Every structure is written in C-alpha cells, then in structure tokens.
C-alpha cells in the first residue's frame, strides 16, 4: 500500500502524541511511503518553531528533522502531484 505522509502525522508519530498509534498503524502498513518535496521545508519549519518556543533543544530539533525525513521513501515533486 502506498502511504502519503503529511507533516502533521509525522509530528504526531515523532512526539508519540495521542493520535500516534493510529498514524503508526497506517504508516506501518505502507510498502512505499511518499511525501511532497515540500515536506522537508514544512517539517523543518514546524520543528524550528518548537525550538524557538523552548519546547525542544537545538540538538533535538536537528534530530527530529532527520527522523521525519528518514520516514519517507521518496519525495515527489509538488508539480507532479
């Protein structure tokens, strides 16, 4: 099954929030995980805001961005979608 991962779902999984089990279940069923190429900018922006708000450290921010990127098998150009 192809899964298109949205940044909000990735954040839920990374931070193991309330809906993370639901998202993880769907994510784990995926044989090909894709996301728009904007995913990288979006997840970086969200996590940078968490860092600026003092919710996560700079080191954690960098690691979580990498974790989010690593969740994706292929990035699809926005124009192709």
What do the predicted segments below correspond to?
Residues 1-38, 50-63:
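Short, well-structured N-terminal submotif of metal-dependent ribonuclease cores
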């Amino acid at each position: 099954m192809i899964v298109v991962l949205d940044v909000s779902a990735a954040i839920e999984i990374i931070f193991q929030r309330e809906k993370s089990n639901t998202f993880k279940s769907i994510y784990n069923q995926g044989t090909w995980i894709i996301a728009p190429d904007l995913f990288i900018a979006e997840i970086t922006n969200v996590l940078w805001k968490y860092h600026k708000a003092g919710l996560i450290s700079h080191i954690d921010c960098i690691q979580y961005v990498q974790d989010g990127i690593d969740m994706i098998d292929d990035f699809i150009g926005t124009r192709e979608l």
